[in-house]
Amino acid sequence: MPRRGYVPKREVLPDPKYQSKLVSKLINVIMEDGKKSISEKICYGAFEIIKEKTGQDPLKVFKQAIENIKPVLEVRPRRVGGATYQVPMEVRPNRRLSLALRWLTTYARQRKEKTMKERLAGEILDAYNNVGSSIKKREETHKMAEANRAFAHYRW
């Protein structure tokens, strides 16, 4: 066991444009190689596209999209007497958010649109409308948990 003290998690500062910690986290997840200004341009550009397409507040659309992506259950491996079982467990709130943001950006990168702004906007709008790859991933995760419900008593 490590003997060092507990290191507190650093608080994420809200982004300058929308004053939202959620947007700030999205920017950090999009960021590659420490290039934050580029990820900010991508994020804000995607929000502009969302505003043009829906005519609604892009922050509200984004928040609803994230709520739609968040998984409730997931399976985690657990070894019991030489066999590894996939045990369904409830996802902690902070992990729900990080998984949702990660899935959103991962599947946005895999889309066919020309620029990352368009891809991200498309994926957010799809998630808002309960369709798209990130929603499919959540459903897949829930299906796995449901299929392994018999092992739920192995929870720890």
Swiss-Prot record:
Keyword Amino-acid biosynthesis: no
CDD domains with a match to the protein in the record: uS7_Bacteria
Domain of life: Bacteria
Keywords associated with the record: Ribonucleoprotein, Ribosomal protein, RNA-binding, rRNA-binding, tRNA-binding
Matches recorded under InterPro entries: Ribosomal_uS7, Ribosomal_uS7_bac/org-type, Ribosomal_uS7_CS, Ribosomal_uS7_dom, Ribosomal_uS7_dom_sf
Pfam families per the UniProt record, alphabetical: Ribosomal_S7 (PF00177)
A cellular-component GO term for this protein: ribosome
Molecular function GO labels: mRNA binding; rRNA binding; structural constituent of ribosome; tRNA binding
Protein name: Small ribosomal subunit protein uS7
Similarity comment: Belongs to the universal ribosomal protein uS7 family.
Single GO BP term: translation
